[in-house]
């Protein structure tokens, strides 16, 4: 959870998740839909999918017990060198190298490893591994992370408070910028326009389940990316006719919302429509659900916000916006 989510946001979600799935066996026995529903709102759902897949392999290959070997850990979905090292050292107190941004900065500065050196990562990893083997791996690796987080800062490091300052080449030479400083984050610059439809057949809402992409395995109101500006109603009609085999009526603009995923800044335009019959010859997985069923299904955060807007008195969950199209009769 902490790989992409803040500690403050993680703590209550972690406690709830562990309460629901206290061990690998209970997680493996759950359906993917149940796991995604429990993860809802934290984004980066590949993490949840990998956890579920890893739990099933842990039960199948290791009898439900998490392995301590780096090779066995690396064979589990979602576990790379860093996570394997963190599990081995922190959970089992066994020697392991683990290099995150904080440890990279601390050891890079102490050792004088320039960011541009081709084998910098390998050298820092080996230094971390050696240090972890010299004491309690659990304490050493966590101490290095804390040192980077609280003292060896990317800018204006607190060298006077650092227990390693006497051995630090970066301090000796006064060149902190050369030794593995922070990596600039990629700016969110890609603007994306999407259209989404809350399509109703009597008192039921049409949902679809993507088979790929970041929301695969979850449920969403039918959605597609817009190639050009405007023409929302036409895009919705095309979406429902092409992918669900149904021609809608009463299409009108409801509002919009914005959401961000990695470098994509997306404006999602929401329209509503009526369906004359159930979808036929659909190219997507779909289902019709009653309003009360929405709470129990895994929905991405933007879709959960749209679902809330369907409740009486909650229409302000969407931005009415300036881009509106006339209602269609």
Where would I find each of the regions flagged by the language model?
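Catalytic cores of DNA base-excision repair glycosylases
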Residues: 2-177, 245-247
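Intrinsically disordered, low-complexity, charged terminal extensions of DNA damage-control enzymes
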Residues: 149-329
């Amino acid at each position: 959870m902490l790989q992409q989510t803040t500690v403050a946001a993680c703590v209550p979600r972690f406690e709830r998740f562990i309460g629901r799935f206290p061990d690998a066996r209970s997680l493996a026995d759950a359906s993917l839909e149940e796991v995604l529903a429990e993860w809802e709102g934290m984004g980066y759902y590949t993490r949840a999918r990998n956890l579920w897949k890893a739990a099933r392999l842990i039960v199948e290959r290791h009898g439900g017990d998490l392995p301590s070997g780096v090779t066995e850990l690396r064979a589990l979905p979602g576990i790379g060198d860093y996570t394997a090292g963190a599990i081995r050292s922190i959970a089992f107190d066994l020697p392991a190298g683990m290099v995150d941004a904080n440890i990279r900065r601390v050891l890079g500065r102490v050792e004088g490893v320039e960011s541009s050196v081709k084998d910098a990562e390998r050298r820092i990893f080996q230094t971390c591994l050696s240090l972890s083997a010299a004491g309690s791996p659990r304490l050493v690796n966590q101490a290095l992370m804390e040192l980077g987080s609280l003292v060896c800062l990317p800018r204006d490091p607190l060298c006077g408070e650092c227990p390693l300052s006497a051995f630090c080449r970066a301090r000796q030479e006064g060149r902190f910028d050369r030794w593995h400083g922070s990596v600039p984050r990629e700016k969110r610059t890609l603007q994306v326009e999407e259209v989404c439809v809350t399509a109703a057949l009597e008192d039921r809402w049409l949902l679809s389940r993507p088979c790929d992409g970041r929301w695969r395995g979850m449920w969403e109101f039918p959605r597609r990316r817009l190639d050009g500006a405007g023409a929302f109603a036409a895009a919705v009609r095309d979406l429902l006719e092409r992918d669900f085999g149904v021609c809608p009526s009463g299409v009108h603009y409801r509002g919009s919302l914005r959401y961000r995923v990695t470098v994509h800044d997306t404006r999602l335009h929401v329209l509503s429509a009526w369906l004359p019959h159930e979808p036929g010859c659909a190219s997507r997985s779909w289902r019709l659900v009653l309003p009360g069923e929405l709470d129990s299904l895994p929905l991405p955060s933007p879709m959960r916000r749209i679902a809330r807007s369907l409740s009486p008195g909650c229409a302000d969950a969407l931005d009415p916006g300036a881009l509106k199209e006339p209602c269609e009769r």
